[in-house]
């Protein structure tokens, strides 16, 4: 999803869209986004968030926290730090809409706390798996995801699964495809 986000930001910038990105990172991470894109980093393994990045898969290619191991205290820290950073981004950047990756906890928080803005969610499949496996705020997540203005699915089968899991209509879900970088492939 990090690659997906980066490529999406690059494509939207090439089409002339102004963007800001809120992303969970480590202090030493380098973010590669177009020059005029404002970054609002949420730093993990810091004083505010003393644990590794919450990974959408149980095994990530970097140090991470599994959602199934996240305590209520950790979930509260996660929510507070991300929401503080997103509020700052919304105040400074004044977006027309918010695009959020993964139909999971952070997207649910965004939907709840920014009701005045259209919020679109991208499904990456790992989010659906996490929701099926973990009880962490499961009903809250389902309720908030159902309120998204638009959901992007990777394919038709996933669209059907999203409609069933979140009780949304087929009209709320758009199949966007997986995407690729044409400069590489």
What are these regions (language model features)?
Residues 1, 103, 123-126, 177-178:
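Histidine-centered beta-alpha loop that forms part of the nucleotide-sugar donor binding/catalytic region
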Residues 2-13:
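Short amphipathic alpha-helix
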Residues 17, 131-133, 163, 171, ...:
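Acidic anion/phosphate-binding donor-loop and adjacent secondary structure
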Residues 24-92:
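A conserved catalytic-core segment of Leloir-type glycosyltransferases
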Residues 25, 157, 179:
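Carbohydrate-associated surface elements
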Residues 97-100, 110-130:
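Active-site proximal beta-strand in glycosyltransferases
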Residues 100-101, 153-154, 175:
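Short beta-strand scaffold positions
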Residues 134-151:
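Membrane-proximal helix-turn-helix segments that form the acceptor-binding/catalytic region
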């Amino acid at each position: 999803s990090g690659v997906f986000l980066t490529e999406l930001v690059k494509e939207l910038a090439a089409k002339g869209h102004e963007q800001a990105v809120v992303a969970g990172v480590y202090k030493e991470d380098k973010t590669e986004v177009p020059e005029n894109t404002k970054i609002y980093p949420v730093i993990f393994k810091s004083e505010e968030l003393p644990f590794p990045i919450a990974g959408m898969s149980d095994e990530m290619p970097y140090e991470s926290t599994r959602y199934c191991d996240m305590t209520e205290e950790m979930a509260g820290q996660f929510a507070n730090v991300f929401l503080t950073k997103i509020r700052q981004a919304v105040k400074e950047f004044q977006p027309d809409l918010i695009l959020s990756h993964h139909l999971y906890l952070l997207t649910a928080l965004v939907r709840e706390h920014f009701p005045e803005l259209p919020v679109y969610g991208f499904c990456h499949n790992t989010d659906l798996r996490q929701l099926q496996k973990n009880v962490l705020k499961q009903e809250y997540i389902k309720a908030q995801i159902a309120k998204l203005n638009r959901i992007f699915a990777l394919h038709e089968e996933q669209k059907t699964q999203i409609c069933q899991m979140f009780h949304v209509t087929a009209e709320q879900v758009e199949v966007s495809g997986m995407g690729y970088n044409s400069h590489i492939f």
